[in-house]
């Protein structure tokens, strides 16, 4: 029996994680955490019977407490509650599927207590990789990627020495606006950006895919996870999302991981690692149904999110935090129809140019830079024309 805690249980990765649990009797849930969706969280509590739950929104937590008063479950709130779920004593592995830098503290606390981490919160590594990776090594825990691309790379590396890697090939679908001109991108609406061609994901990550910021975040994540320099991480557009990523070795051989676009595959792989693979219901890849597999170079001119990510990581220190925080707020403003689609990356670039760089930031300094970046974006939106 493997016992898991799920942070972000009502989101896209969280609900798919619970689908995997539902299909496997040797997985048990000890803790669930959500932001504010207490209707779905209550359903999850009644089905999976966790000991502990957290609702980040304190008012919603009080309401949930009343709703589940007939059950033996402890309801916590806020950051303290999130950390309590991440460190729940009986949990063997913590699924970190919250959105944004809110996941940093809970993940660090879980590692300190020797928990393995199934990792879907890339922002945590992007901003605090220099703090988290030494902890992973010190406490000898597994940091298991749940992103389809990083899981693919992780699988390709099994049985191979990392010293023999010559290149990591990180694939991308190109998002809904692959091949679009700058003129076409000027008139993009929220509904257009939320139509990903291949994957079913949450709203924020779907927008990140459209701007190519998501792939930039994944480059940073790959740097930390696989200890490779940026010049050995190459992004390749693979529009059909069949090749999830690949690794080239120094003898010229390339190992790739292929499959249908189903997030439950990397989730289940992480939950059971290092055990043997388990049966997973779902559609199988039929090579005879594939009309073609094509490859393209990413468009860093019209969709500069990837270029900005490389620049942020090359500068290092607190700049990846600025990149991430600026993107988080800009995406939220776009989804609220306050700014245009192209303004997202314009604001990121402006923030990277103006927010003070902090060298080797501590956790507190990372959070301060995050707030400073939010404040800068708010001021910039007031004084400049980023609106639709």
Curated annotation (Swiss-Prot):
PANTHER family: 1-DEOXY-D-XYLULOSE 5-PHOSPHATE REDUCTOISOMERASE, 1-DEOXY-D-XYLULOSE 5-PHOSPHATE REDUCTOISOMERASE, CHLOROPLASTIC
GO biological process: isopentenyl diphosphate biosynthetic process, methylerythritol 4-phosphate pathway involved in terpenoid biosynthetic process
Name of the encoding gene: dxr
Keyword terms, alphabetized: Isoprene biosynthesis, Manganese, Metal-binding, NADP, Oxidoreductase
Top enzyme category: oxidoreductase
UniProt KW Aminoacyl-tRNA synthetase keyword: no
Gene3D superfamilies: 1.10.1740.10, NAD(P)-binding Rossmann-like Domain (3.40.50.720)
Family: Belongs to the DXR family.
Amino acids binding 1-deoxy-D-xylulose 5-phosphate: 122, 148-149, 173, 196, 209, 214-215, 218
Protein's UniProt keywords contain Manganese: yes
Binding site for NADPH: 10-13, 37, 121, 123, 202
Residues the record lists as binding Mn(2+): 147, 149, 218
A Pfam family hit: DXP_reductoisom
Protein task: Catalyzes the NADPH-dependent rearrangement and reduction of 1-deoxy-D-xylulose-5-phosphate (DXP) to 2-C-methyl-D-erythritol 4-phosphate (MEP).
Cofactor requirement: Mg(2+); Mn(2+)
One GO molecular-function entry: NADPH binding
Enzyme Commission identifier(s): 1.1.1.267
UniProt superkingdom: Bacteria
Pathway: Isoprenoid biosynthesis; isopentenyl diphosphate biosynthesis via DXP pathway; isopentenyl diphosphate from 1-deoxy-D-xylulose 5-phosphate: step 1/6
Name used for this protein in its record: 1-deoxy-D-xylulose 5-phosphate reductoisomerase
Catalytic activity: 2-C-methyl-D-erythritol 4-phosphate + NADP(+) = 1-deoxy-D-xylulose 5-phosphate + NADPH + H(+)
Ranges annotated as spanning the membrane: none
